């Protein structure tokens, strides 16, 4: 069944139901630090009450309630031109389709695509550290335990020939996940240790597909910057500059993630990054030596940059 049928009471015929969640709130005035992180809280609340809503509907609701001027208020550009509500609606629609609806997959692509997982930095988890090796730490706290990269391939074998985590699922999902050729590619490296030259649905090798995914994530974030800059005439300057600044940090961090992961895993694949893709701009040695001096409860003003 689904979580939705539990929360609406239809699965177990309960007249009263509840749902709880965990999120990254802090002591900032807006709770979440990043203005757009509030959209996740809003989505959670809306789905708790009406699970049939689509992500597009929720995104549209949140954007209009967050950025539309108060009813009756006049919105002017710096040049004194009056902006019509239809103009703002069109820009919010673009923001919804090109940023809100794509933001999750963009982050997955430039951080941990194709089912990679737990390859972030020790402790605070900000930034990439697939090479992390802490003396005397539990193996399952360290990235190499999860990515299992070697000269043969990459990924954690949770199939019936490995830890058999796939056996926890009912048929036919069990069989689908257990087969490297039918396992959804966004989960592939979670369930399988896959050879670097394994052919993907795109026709590319696994190594090339990994490179394309990281590159796609970086370019998506750069597009977020372009879409957001279109919003300048339509919202207050304080929030515009705040989000613009945060997107600059995200764009730099995306390149940091891409370069760190591809250069590190390239040591095992021993293959070139496809020549049509953007070249790394950082040195692996520099990134491996870099340490962020932050706790688990704060975000840095910037990530790696050298």
Language model features with spans:
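Catalytic domains of carbohydrate-active enzymes that cleave complex glycans
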Residues: 2-69, 84-305
């Amino acid at each position: 069944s689904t979580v939705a049928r539990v929360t609406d009471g239809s699965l177990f015929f309960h007249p009263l139901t509840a749902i709880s969640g965990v999120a990254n709130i802090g002591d900032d005035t807006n709770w979440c630090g990043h203005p757009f992180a509030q959209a996740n809280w809003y989505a959670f609340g809306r789905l708790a009450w009406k699970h049939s809503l689509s992500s597009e509907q929720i995104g549209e609701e949140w954007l209009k309630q967050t950025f539309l001027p108060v009813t009756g208020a006049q919105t002017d550009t710096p040049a004194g031109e009056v902006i019509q509500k239809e103009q703002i609606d069109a820009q919010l629609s673009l923001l919804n389709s090109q940023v809100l609806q794509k933001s999750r997959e963009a982050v997955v692509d430039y951080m941990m695509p194709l089912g990679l997982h737990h390859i972030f930095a020790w402790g605070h988890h900000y930034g990439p550290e697939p090479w992390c090796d802490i003396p005397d730490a539990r193996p399952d706290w360290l990235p190499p335990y999860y990515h299992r990269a070697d000269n043969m391939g990459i990924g954690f074998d949770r199939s019936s020939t490995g830890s058999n985590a796939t056996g926890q699922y009912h048929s036919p999902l069990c069989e689908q996940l257990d087969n490297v050729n039918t396992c959804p590619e966004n989960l592939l490296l979670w369930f399988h240790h896959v050879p670097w030259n394994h052919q993907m649905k795109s026709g590319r090798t696994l190594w090339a597909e990994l490179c394309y995914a990281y590159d796609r994530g970086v370019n998506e974030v750069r597009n977020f910057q372009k879409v957001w800059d279109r919003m300048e005439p339509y919202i207050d300057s304080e929030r515009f500059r705040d989000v613009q600044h945060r997107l600059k940090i995200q764009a730099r961090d995306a390149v940091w993630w891409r370069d760190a992961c591809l250069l590190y895993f390239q040591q095992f694949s021993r293959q070139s990054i496809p020549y049509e893709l953007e070249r790394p701009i950082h040195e692996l040695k520099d990134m491996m030596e870099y340490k962020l001096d932050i706790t688990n409860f704060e975000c840095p003003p910037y990530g790696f940059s050298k």
